[in-house]
Curated annotation (Swiss-Prot):
Binding-site residues, heme b: 87
Protein encoded by which gene: HBAA
UniProt keyword annotation of Metal-binding present: yes
Quaternary organization: Heterotetramer of two alpha chains and two beta chains.
UniProt-recorded name of the protein: Hemoglobin subunit alpha-A
Signal peptide: none
């Protein structure tokens, strides 16, 4: 459960990300594909080269989902309900991959905003990303 301080910290980080969300989404995916190559199996039709149009497009979707979750931080489940259905019923993505994606997003934020990622903010952002992952896998059962 995200505390009031967690919510403030997460919103603060996303305000710093601002117009870079799409870029960070693509960078997160690229990092995940390199660090966790097994995740590539869900994207057999993608050009997985650095800067590919497909990675940029999917990175934009990832970023949009995270921004949507931040904008509805008190109802992440409601905000991401359709996306949860898609991942559980159609895409059937292994739930561990959301943890991988979250970790890679944390790394991207740390690279671009090192001073913003204090231990407290890091913990809040990690809790938020875990909450998003939990929502996206809730309908698997």
């Amino acid at each position: 459960v995200l505390s009031a301080a967690d919510k403030t910290n997460v919103k603060g980080v996303f305000s710093k990300i601002g117009g870079h969300a799409d870029e960070y989404g693509a960078e997160t995916l690229e990092r995940m594909f390199v660090a966790y190559p097994q995740t590539k199996t869900y994207f057999p039709h993608f050009d997985l080269q650095h800067g590919s149009a497909q990675i940029k497009a999917h990175g934009k979707k990832v970023a949009a989902a995270l921004v949507e979750a931040v904008n509805h931080i008190d109802d992440i489940a409601g905000a991401l309900s359709k996306l949860s259905d898609l991942h559980a019923q159609k895409l059937r993505v292994d739930p561990v991959n959301f943890k991988f994606l979250g970790h890679c997003f944390l790394v991207v934020v740390a690279i671009h905003h090192p001073s913003a990622l204090t231990p407290e903010v890091h913990a809040s952002l990690d809790k938020f990303l875990c909450a998003v992952g939990t929502v996206l896998t809730a309908k698997y059962r």
